[in-house]
Design a protein with these regions (language model features):
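Histidine-centered, transition-metal-coordinating active-site segments
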Residues: 1-75, 79, 83-89, 96-97, ...
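Aspartate-rich (DDxxD/NDxxD/DxxxD) Mg2+/diphosphate-binding motifs
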Residues: 99-125
Length: 334
């Protein structure tokens, strides 16, 4: 028995009957030999973590566009927080932590530069709405590894797709990633908003703070612990109704006070205009696309490929390409 086989056996011994077992995966789009050391979900997490798309999350906006300060969240720090929350909940419920971690690592790979401003920009240019969860699945299925994709397991792929939107993953681990994403972004966006001077702790509605807590750590702790304890008590995945309602109310509060605040969105129109102009440029000049994108034109069409290229940009790379293409360079006398 090798290391992987021993770990798969231990999953049957220690995990809940409701947990997704690595040995029972529905498999990958292209069959592969098993690894001697890592389970299939561990391999998926490693593939995502070592991908170029994951590294680019470091330079993609979470909420605040181009903030002045080193402590604001990026897509990467958000992703890491989601993964930790998901693992904690899965550990408490004896579910598969490796599956949840892999889906969490991949859930935002398809996000555009400049956050949801970029998503809106591409939606205005494409023939159908741009949805980052669908793009995240496209990244791992088709765009990574120069078009070969990462060949991830079905359960991780559906966890990525179902972290937002109407589709609900069939595994409990995938559903936990969905909840962990919301727990993470609501709470760390409050923290960033306080850092930006948009909010103070006293601004949080009293009835919400009374239930969830009066600090960043208290709120996350309340939500995570309640998710675990209520699920164990009821046998159904979820928080107590009053706690779930308080989280929804906090999210509504954030939309009213932060997500539409001029400080957070002050540069959004500029970001949209920049990406739309880049999109138009590459539609007219496809030969200027990177060479590795060109072979896909015959299969996916110009609009889709240009959208892939722009969605994959980091904030600073989009600014660089815009400056390179549209801003006159300074003459240098030699």
């Amino acid at each position: 028995m090798n290391v992987r086989e021993r770990m798969e056996q231990e999953e049957y011994e220690f995990l809940s009957p409701q947990a997704q077992k690595a040995a029972e995966t529905k498999g990958r789009p292209e069959p592969e030999d098993d690894n001697d050391v890592r389970t299939c979900y561990q391999r998926d997490a490693d593939r995502i973590l070592h991908s170029k798309s994951f590294r680019r999350l470091m330079h993609k906006t979470q909420v605040f566009l181009s903030p002045e300060g080193d402590h604001y969240r990026t897509r990467m720090t958000h992703t890491l927080e989601v993964a930790r929350i998901a693992r904690t909940i899965c550990r408490g419920l004896r579910l598969n932590q490796d599956l949840a971690e892999a889906a969490a690592y991949g859930h935002d790979l398809g996000h555009t530069p400049f956050g949801h401003a970029g998503e809106k920009a591409l939606s205005s240019m494409l023939d159908k709405p741009f949805r980052h969860n669908e793009q995240s699945l496209r990244v791992v299925d088709k765009l990574e590894r120069d078009g070969a994709g990462l060949n991830l397991t079905y359960e991780v792929r559906m966890g990525i797709l179902g972290h937002t939107g109407d589709f609900i993953p069939e595994t409990l681990e995938g559903q936990i990633v969905r909840t962990s994403d919301r727990i993470a972004y609501i709470n760390h966006d409050i923290d960033d908003a306080m850092r930006a001077g948009i909010l103070t702790e006293a601004d949080i509605p009293a009835q919400i703070a009374e239930i969830l807590g009066h600090s960043h750590s208290q709120r996350i702790n309340t939500l995570v612990e309640n998710m675990i304890e209520n699920t164990m008590l009821t046998g159904t995945l979820g928080m107590q109704p009053d706690v779930a309602q308080a989280m929804d109310q906090l999210r509504t509060f954030m939309f009213a006070r932060v997500y539409t605040n001029p400080v957070a969105k002050g540069e959004e129109s500029k970001a949209k205009d920049m990406l739309c102009r880049l999109f138009e440029y590459y539609m007219k000049n496809p030969e200027r696309l990177p060479p590795d994108f060109l072979p896909q034109l015959d299969f996916d069409g110009m609009e889709r490929i240009v959208g892939d290229y722009i969605a994959g940009m980091t904030d600073r790379y989009a600014v660089h390409k815009y400056s390179e293409l549209f801003i006159p360079a300074t003459w240098q006398v030699r």
